[in-house]
């Protein structure tokens, strides 16, 4: 059987815990036979902690992975001081993402796993995107088609509105956007997760899902019409569901993904249930992208040594999920 292409792991912010996580993930996976990846980063950041092999192409990664961390060099502009981000190194962070996406689009990487970035650091360097997701969509020439899923073993959630204020989220919530997000999520569950008959739970916006219009009418005027249109397409969806009960132990087994109306409605339950193994997944793009569901953790960043201070669980989950999604796309899924 042909070996699947390796995953591309990005640098993230070099002053954060990304380099620590890359080294520790390699230690955990090197002998597993799964999750082979190469790191697009500065080898100087990790070479004192783990054996490193600098590679020129992704195709070289698998042959060296058991013995050393494959690094496709992306040098930082100035010295990296752990815990002290420097916008002069933003170019390396951006280049790492750009190259990873190019390899994935060409089929030379099975997917992209992104280490955490600091949005304010990139913004200070003139980066015009609010985050990873929007940049990835632009690189794939599909702006506006991307949606964010947070996934853990216990729950999958997709917010309809994402990185905007709550006031702005309410202003931009439309029937059309709910339908678009649900359609993308439904297709992704089939293609990337092997769920042939996805069950979607559509959250209400207001307390008690509006209580028949007594606590707001968005469920009647916006959400229910979206559900009707989705059902007309043959998509299995239920709702509008009261947000205060749909994440209970009894409710979760009855759906495969929760379509939520705004950011915190989706992320609070997922992070409460499983902060350590939550994975950020970008859906709606031609490439696979996952990311650990945490930030740069500048407060615990330190020199990369043989002992990792950061919890690598979420990154390992992101690598595992990217590998599983790649397998489903190639017809190798379990």
From Swiss-Prot:
Residues binding substrate, per UniProt: 132-133, 271, 280, 289
Cofactor: Zn(2+); Mg(2+); Co(2+)
Name the record gives this protein: 4-hydroxythreonine-4-phosphate dehydrogenase
Source species: Gluconobacter oxydans (strain 621H)
Compartments where located: Cytoplasm
Recorded name of the encoding gene: pdxA
HAMAP family in alphabetical order: PdxA
Note: The active site is located at the dimer interface.
First-tier enzyme category under EC: oxidoreductase
Pfam families associated with the record: PdxA
Pathway: Cofactor biosynthesis; pyridoxine 5'-phosphate biosynthesis; pyridoxine 5'-phosphate from D-erythrose 4-phosphate: step 4/5
Record's keyword terms, sorted: Cobalt, Cytoplasm, Magnesium, Metal-binding, NAD, NADP, Oxidoreductase, Pyridoxine biosynthesis, Zinc
Catalysed reactions, as listed in the record: 4-(phosphooxy)-L-threonine + NAD(+) = 3-amino-2-oxopropyl phosphate + CO2 + NADH
Binding site for a divalent metal cation: 163, 208, 263
InterPro entries: PdxA, PdxA_fam
Gene Ontology BP terms: pyridoxal phosphate biosynthetic process; pyridoxine biosynthetic process
Broad class of where this protein is predominantly found: cytoplasm
GO MF: 4-hydroxythreonine-4-phosphate dehydrogenase activity; cobalt ion binding; magnesium ion binding; NAD binding; zinc ion binding
Known EC number: 1.1.1.262
Role: Catalyzes the NAD(P)-dependent oxidation of 4-(phosphooxy)-L-threonine (HTP) into 2-amino-3-oxo-4-(phosphooxy)butyric acid which spontaneously decarboxylates to form 3-amino-2-oxopropyl phosphate (AHAP).
The family this protein is said to belong to: Belongs to the PdxA family.
């Amino acid at each position: 059987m042909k070996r699947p292409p390796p995953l591309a792991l990005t640098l993230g912010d070099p002053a954060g815990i990304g380099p620590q996580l890359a080294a520790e993930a390699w230690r955990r996976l090197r002998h597993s036979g799964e999750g082979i990846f190469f790191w697009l980063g500065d080898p100087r950041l990790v070479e004192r902690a783990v054996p490193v092999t600098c590679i020129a192409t992704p195709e070289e990664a698998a042959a060296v992975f058991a013995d050393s961390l494959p690094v496709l060099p992306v040098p930082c502009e100035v010295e990296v001081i752990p815990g002290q981000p420097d916008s002069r190194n933003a170019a390396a962070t951006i280049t790492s993402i750009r190259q990873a996406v190019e390899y994935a689009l060409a089929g030379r990487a099975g997917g992209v796993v992104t280490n955490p970035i600091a949005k304010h650091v990139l913004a200070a360097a003139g980066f015009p995107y609010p985050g990873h997701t929007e940049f990835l969509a632009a690189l794939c020439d599909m702006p506006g088609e991307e949606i964010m899923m947070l996934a853990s073993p216990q729950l999958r959630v997709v917010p309809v509105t994402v990185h905007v204020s709550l006031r702005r989220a309410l202003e931009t919530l439309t029937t059309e956007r709910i339908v678009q997000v649900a359609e993308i999520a439904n297709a992704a569950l089939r293609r990337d997760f092997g769920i042939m008959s996805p069950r979607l739970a559509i959250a209400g916006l207001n307390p008690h899902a509006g209580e028949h219009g007594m606590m707001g009418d968005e469920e009647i005027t916006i959400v229910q019409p979206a559900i009707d249109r989705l059902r007309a397409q043959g998509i299995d969806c239920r709702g509008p569901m009261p947000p205060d009960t749909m994440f209970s132990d009894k409710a979760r087994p009855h759906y495969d993904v929760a379509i939520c109306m705004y950011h915190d409605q989706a992320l609070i339950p997922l992070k409460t249930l499983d902060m350590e193994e939550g994975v950020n997944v970008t859906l709606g793009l031609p490439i696979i992208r996952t990311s650990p569901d945490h930030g740069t953790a500048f407060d615990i960043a330190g020199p990369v040594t043989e002992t990792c201070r950061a919890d690598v669980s979420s990154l390992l989950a992101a690598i595992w999920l990217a590998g599983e999604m790649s397998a489903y796309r190639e017809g190798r899924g379990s």
